[in-house]
Amino acid sequence: MSDNLTDLPGVGPSTAEKLVEAGYIDFMKIATATVGELTDIEGISEKAAAKMIMGARDLCDLGFKSGIDLLKQRSTVWKLSTSSSELDSVLGGGLESQSVTEFAGVFGSGKTQIMHQSCVNLQNPEFLFYDEEAVSKGEVAQPKAVYIDTEGTFRPERIMQMAEHAGIDGQTVLDNTFVARAYNSDMQMLFAEKIEDLIQEGNNIKLVVIDSLTSTFRNEYTGRGKLAERQQKLGRHMATLNKLADLFNCVVLVTNQVSAKPDAFFGMAEQAIGGHIVGHAATFRFFVRKGKGDKRVAKLYDSPHLPDAEAIFRITEKGIQD
């Protein structure tokens, strides 16, 4: 339900209508907007935008919180199983909501398979873990996923195959998965921004997948001369994803390409694309590599509270397995 935007300072019926048309239908959306974003709307000055944002933040009670309040907020985090008990264990129980989790690796390492499996598992209530006192069943009822495909690797038939082996109706999984093919970085960013529209239309989006995060940026911005522009744009995209995760309590997963690390004598010989921008914006970072046969190894190497660890899992016809 939308808020009464005329309660904001300097907002009359006409301005409220313009805000709604631009997608700003509630106080939280305005409170987390920037002055530059609001001034893109015709008739709104910088001064007026700043007043609206401050007013919305007051109404949303945004500001400092005690550690106890944040601990209570953490109890609203829910987790999604990966289908691998080892990988779930490394993650502390599963893929976390209110977080962005990155899986980087070379081609064929299994990144896209993890993304497909996550879409399937979202439709299995037994794979959703949460504190029933902090998270209502309605919060995770009829969950839906958004899959932004930048490399043309989404395969509905693979979803059907995984779902069949998991005892889930494949048609249900596909019905509850919105897929968008992004051919460039502008499309990719636009689709991510449009997810809020899907939510406002009544879709309970609980999983957002970007596969892959950096391929479009990497193709368009080549050479050192365009590196700064690329990183700024990528930073804005990551900010959008983090905002979605926080505001709507959803799981956000991204896959990432890697490049050679020529100065690496010890440790990983490859590094994820995106540099410090992605490194600071992603909550959990995994490096996935091939093992023997159908085995894969996922190494957690960055997390705010979990230790570095490795998990071995298999990719079979049935999907992700121990």
UniProtKB/Swiss-Prot annotation:
SUPFAM superfamilies linked: P-loop containing nucleoside triphosphate hydrolases, Rad51 N-terminal domain-like
Highest rank taxon of the organism: Archaea
Keywords for the protein's UniProt record, in alphabetical order: ATP-binding, DNA damage, DNA recombination, DNA-binding, Nucleotide-binding
Keyword DNA-binding: yes
Record InterPro entries: AAA+_ATPase (IPR003593), DNA_recomb/repair_Rad51_C (IPR013632), DNA_recomb/repair_RadA (IPR011938), DNA_recomb/repair_RecA-like (IPR016467), DNA_repair_Rad51/TF_NusA_a-hlx (IPR010995), Hlx-hairpin-Hlx_DNA-bd_motif (IPR003583), P-loop_NTPase (IPR027417), RecA_ATP-bd (IPR020588)
Pfam families: HHH_5, Rad51
Residues at which ATP binds: 105-112
GO molecular function: ATP binding; ATP hydrolysis activity; ATP-dependent DNA damage sensor activity; damaged DNA binding; identical protein binding
Membrane-spanning segments: none
General function of this protein: Involved in DNA repair and in homologous recombination. Binds and assemble on single-stranded DNA to form a nucleoprotein filament. Hydrolyzes ATP in a ssDNA-dependent manner and promotes DNA strand exchange between homologous DNA molecules.
Similarity-based family: Belongs to the eukaryotic RecA-like protein family.
Protein name, entry field: DNA repair and recombination protein RadA
Species classification: Archaea, Methanobacteriati, Methanobacteriota, Methanomada group, Methanococci
